[in-house]
Regions:
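Charged, low-complexity intrinsically disordered segments
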Residues: 25-169
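Compositionally biased, low-complexity segments enriched in small residues
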Residues: 2-3, 20, 29
Length: 169
């Protein structure tokens, strides 16, 4: 084998190892961090959804690691509130699109600004139109999503023992 072919094979091997590593890293995540962000809710402050009823971008300056994932907050007060009661503020279904979970699948693509708080729980959705539909039909859709979540989690091949208790009704 020529030196050039060995170099090509080496580069291809490293590329494949990188892809496999990326897949296994995302499969081990306990929280939806999107494709590239590595941070929960794409860096938005989970507490602000409840205190300000809007999506507010957090800061790395006010971060806290929970379930192996960094969470960002707009200020130290929000970070402290989350640290004291994280279950109160985390999005349902691991931060995956609640509308997709209803259908038995997931997309990591959620719009942090397309959210609904229903019965004191945060639901992230793919887009605003679907968020409005989800909220308008919550009595039907939330139980379906909740029933589908264990199946969807299994499809993700993610070991998330903490989500079992967090997202139980």
């Amino acid at each position: 084998m020529s030196r050039r072919n060995k170099n090509v094979l080496a580069v291809a091997g490293f590329a494949l190892a990188g892809i496999a590593g990326a897949v296994s890293a995302s499969a081990d995540d306990s929280v939806n961090t999107g494709y590239f962000g590595g941070v929960a809710i794409m860096g938005y402050d989970p507490v602000a959804y409840f205190t300000e009823n809007q999506a507010v971008k957090g800061s790395e300056k006010f971060s806290y690691e929970w379930l192996g994932t960094p969470w960002h907050f707009a200020n130290s007060k929000h970070r402290e509130m989350f640290m004291n009661e994280p279950v109160k503020y985390v999005p349902q279904y691991g931060g995956y699109c609640a509308g997709e979970v209803v259908g038995g699948s997931v997309t990591v693509n959620v719009d942090p600004e397309a959210f609904k708080i229903i019965d004191g729980k945060l639901y992230l959705i793919y887009d605003e139109g679907n968020a409005n539909h989800f909220a308008a039909n919550a009595k039907e859709l939330v139980p379906k999503a909740t029933a589908n979540w264990p199946i969807v989690k299994a499809k993700l091949e993610v070991d998330q023992p903490n989500w079992e208790s967090i997202n139980s009704p």
